[in-house]
Amino acid sequence: MATTETFEISKPEPEWRRLLTPEQFRVLRKHGTEHAWSSPLDKEYGSGSYLCAGCDLPLFASDTKFDSGTGWPSFWDPIEGAVRTSTDRKLFMVRTEVHCRRCGGHLGHVFDDGPNPTGLRYCMNGIALKFVRA
């Protein structure tokens, strides 16, 4: 993990590999990025909650989801206290990484080009999320 934080849920790498699909492991544990438009959650607009695929912590409510046109599920606000951020200096730029506050799984990045009321765009990897209908 890029961060030195400690988390409520901590597992050794072999256990994460057993619990997650190879692609989930690559994104959540190794800070990967799925291909744009590859996740069915990008176009999911049902009522419900988006949970961390690593630990099932509710992260986003469906009423904060919007179509950003980027090919990744995007939200304008997380559930209070559900995510943490850290500075990501990879790819020759500075970005704000978003990770699950409970297991530390990499979710995506947050940008300041989102809609009102926050002006933020939480650009998430769909493979890092689970959608649970209300």
Question: Where are the predicted features?
Answer:
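A short Gly-Trp-Pro
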Residues: 7-134
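Accessory (non-J-domain) regions of J-domain/Hsp40 co-chaperones
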Residues: 1-7
